[in-house]
Swiss-Prot record:
Function according to Swiss-Prot or TrEMBL: Regulates the composition and fluidity of the plasma membrane. Inhibits the incorporation of membrane-fluidizing phospholipids containing omega-3 long-chain polyunsaturated fatty acids (LCPUFA) and thereby promotes membrane rigidity. Does not appear to have any effect on LCPUFA synthesis.
Cytoplasmic topological intervals: 68-83, 195-201
Protein name (Swiss-Prot/TrEMBL): TLC domain-containing protein 1
Gene: Tlcd1
Signal peptide coordinates: 1-27
Domain TLC: 40-234
Extracellular side: 28-46, 105-123, 145-173, 223-247
Amino acid sequence: MPLLFHPAWPLLLGATLTFRALRRVLCRLPQPAHVQTDPLRTWRWHNLLVSFTHSIVSGIWALLCLWQTPEMLVEIETAWSASGYLLVCFSAGYFIHDTVDIVVSKQTRASWEYLVHHVMAMGAFFSGIFWKRFVGGGVLTLLVEVSNIFLTLRMMMKINNAQDLLLYKVNKYINLVMYFLFRLAPQAYLTKFFLQYAGQRTLGTFLLAILLMLDLMIIIYFSRLLRSDFCPERAPRRQQKDKFLTE
């Protein structure tokens, strides 16, 4: 079947439009007073609300997929389920939406790291969507969204200058645990699996290259998280206006 007429396109379009509609709904919700005074913070707040929703849905969905189809933990290339396939399409739609939102809102320069991440994620997910291979790998990758629930909550509190809240202080320790369990551990497991494709000229080799770049980004983000929350005196000083965009 020609790629142009692949039945996954309506799923991707539907997922993308769903997140677009969700953003419109979330924009109508009351905002913290501190956020309302700054257009950039307002945009970022709405962006994070959508991200927070995606993380909750896809994180729980990924756990359910692995519970329903545990062979995805071992047969990463060949294991497949309708639920896992729809999850990958759902998350790809989010990344498409967020990429468009960043570009249209002229936040490309401030959010270029997110764009790089989204492009790599979409490149990896499309292998599962259009060729129905490595769907299990896509589901395992989306375990990271469980960690993102707490990371996004952290960023939302920082935007609102709420670092002194007890919730923020408790959340930073939860973040460490979740980062290890749902970000570092799955990433290490996937990297070990995909190393078998090193030196080949296959789809697995392409995904290995993406995975290694994501590994580097994850390590960099982890070091920033540690500096910002546990060694603030060592964290690089930035203008307060755009600090929340990258930390």
